[in-house]
């Protein structure tokens, strides 16, 4: 049995390609294949779910033993770091925070966070609005009162953009900040 867990980078804009690869592995090996956590993250990707189900149905009609399981809920949880480019996270948390404190790197990160056409999947943009991002976990006691608030609310109160607020909270809390 081949089990393919569709991890964060393959649960949104590229999830159809990931599912196609799972089907291709089943076809090439003759083994049973299951796509775990099949989901279309991001409102713009929701219409693609019908195509994903059709892909599984077509594979089964072809005689392949292919299946998928899906999340049974309409929300997810991650960290605000899921809104950052992968390169800024390289080397671990401490290296990332050091980069986010560098004004030149911070400017580059902000530009990439605002670009809907970057190659990486920005889960903040996929959410569709900072009103949909609820802050759920802080380590710093001074930030804990923000728990349960939306990113949009906190950004408005601080007078900063959503992107700047993401970076500020990650640095201030010295954590990924649950959202």
Where are these regions (language model features)?
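Extended, charged catalytic domains and RNA/DNA-binding interfaces, predominantly
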Residues: 1-6
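Active-site neighborhoods of metal-dependent hydrolases
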Residues: 7-32, 36-179
């Amino acid at each position: 049995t081949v089990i393919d867990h569709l991890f964060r980078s393959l649960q949104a804009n590229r999830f159809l390609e990931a599912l196609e690869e799972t089907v291709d592995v089943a076809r090439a090996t003759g083994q049973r294949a299951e796509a775990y956590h099949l989901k279309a993250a991001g409102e713009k990707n929701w219409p693609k779910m019908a195509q994903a189900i059709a892909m599984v149905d077509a594979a089964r009609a072809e005689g392949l033993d292919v299946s998928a399981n899906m999340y049974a809920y309409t929300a997810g949880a991650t960290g605000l770091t899921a809104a950052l480019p992968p390169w800024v996270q390289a080397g671990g948390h401490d290296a990332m925070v050091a980069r986010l404190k560098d004004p030149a790197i911070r400017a580059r990160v902000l530009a990439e966070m605002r670009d809907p056409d970057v190659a990486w999947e920005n889960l903040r943009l996929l959410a569709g609005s900072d009103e949909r991002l609820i802050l759920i976990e802080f380590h710093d006691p001074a930030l804990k009162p923000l728990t349960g608030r939306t990113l949009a609310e906190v950004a408005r109160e601080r007078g900063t953009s959503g992107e700047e607020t993401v970076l500020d909270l990650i640095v201030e809390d010295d954590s990924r900040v649950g959202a």
